[in-house]
Regions:
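Outer-membrane beta-barrel proteins
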Residues: 2-17, 22-210
């Protein structure tokens, strides 16, 4: 993940949002394969033409998993775990995510993730630390407000503390013959990517029980 003029992490974002939008529900053990015409994470470009894959486990609200993507100079490998539950009409979650790299593309990110959802709206917050191996450690907070209905979603998100910048996504995800398809319009501001940027991204994926 590259953020605000700094090399930064996570990639559950784009493909994960599309899988949720298309109504994918996990079993106890599940796996996924995906491809994106461009890999952007949290509004920041990572790589053209990127393949990815992951394995997840969920039971009784607890979840854990790993996800990897091609970033050109090696792989990004994410690990995560947490717990989610419904309290009345509100869904709540708390978890941890670590972003690691096999090559020189980026350094390690680690963060605590908090989430809340009510009706069509969801709010996600991540409080993290960037272990910049060539410089001082940096702290960041990420926030995202998402509105989702019938496969369509809109998201406004951004960073604060040592990272800065904002972006906006409009997307649609659907499933055709058990294949997940998605399209995203992404608008990133100049604080996030050095110059304002607009992108159209296409994704395809397959999720299956193990």
């Amino acid at each position: 993940m590259k953020a605000a003029n700094i090399t930064s992490p996570v990639k559950l974002g784009l493909i994960g949002s599309l899988l949720l939008a298309s109504g994918f529900a996990q079993a106890d053990w599940s796996a996924n394969l995906g491809y994106a015409s461009e890999y952007h994470y949290r509004g920041i470009f990572q790589k053209n033409s990127s393949a990815s894959g992951g394995v997840d486990y969920e039971t009784g609200g607890f979840y854990a998993g790993t996800w990897a993507a091609d970033v050109g100079d090696g792989l990004e490998v994410d690990g995560y775990f947490g717990y989610g539950a419904d309290v009345g009409d509100v869904s709540l979650s708390v978890g941890y995510t670590g972003y690691f790299y096999t090559g020189d593309f980026d350094d390690t990110y680690q963060e605590i993730n908090l989430g809340a959802g009510f009706g069509l709206l969801s709010l996600d917050v991540a409080v993290g630390e960037y272990e910049n191996f060539s410089g001082p450690t940096q702290d960041y907070t990420y926030y995202a407000l998402t509105l989702e209905k019938d496969g369509f979603y809109g998201k406004y998100a951004g960073f604060s503390q040592d990272f800065e910048g904002n972006y906006f996504e409009l997307g649609y995800g659907t499933t055709v013959s058990e294949i997940d398809l998605g399209i995203v319009l992404l608008f990133s501001d100049s604080d996030l990517v050095g110059d304002s940027d607009e992108n159209i991204i296409f994704t395809i994926g397959k999720a299956f029980d193990l």
